Amino acid sequence: MSVWDDILTPTDREVIRRGGYGKPRGLGERPALLLIDPQYNYAGADKPILDQIQEWPSGVGESAWRAVERLKSLIQAFREKKRPVLYTRQVQKNIAFDGFAAKAVRSSSQYLEGSKGTSIVEDIAPREGDLVIDKSYASAFYGTPLLSILIKLKVDTLIVAGGTTGGCVRATCVDAVSRNFDVAVVEDCVFDRISASHKVALLDLWMKYCDVISSYAALDYVTRL
């Protein structure tokens, strides 16, 4: 059962069946793990979302921290196989000219370089050999050297986790597929503030763009390389 099953109407299910949506794309042999914005601004505190929203207005709360916990073994598996582990951070150098999220009221200082909010959560912090790419917009490809790095590393597949599902994760996955990478989103390692956004984004990615797999399937894939 997929996380989006409870939002589908009978007509939706028939459209998917008759239209042939959601067929597996498959994964290649040279993957990288791409962790989208696993930083304090978006993870927030390990509490129910409403209990931490005043301190972390963009934070997802406890569901993000459950994803972080599951990510530990996946990150370790990639490192053991000597496959690339890449992180992105949403970070602004100058809030007046940098950044895109103008539709939410936020404290600009949380998004400036040097604030705790821009730091990757300590539980899954990068190690020597991992790469961290700073970005200012939703897609990890926009205005960053990510594509050049992936080409240099001869990566053919991206295993994507992080947040938020309906924002930066979705934008990055669509751009990755548009650049001819095989892509899988790890369903239980992505997170969003809004349950509906999370489910609809995963449904849309699964239907039209990339594979959506569990952390167990992702672990099995990388350990078999």
Name what the model sees in each region.
Residues 38, 90, 188:
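Active-site loop/turn elements of alpha/beta-hydrolase fold enzymes
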Residues 44-52, 100-102:
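Short, flexible, mixed-charge acidic loops at enzyme active sites
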Residues 65-84:
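A short, N-terminal amphipathic alpha-helix
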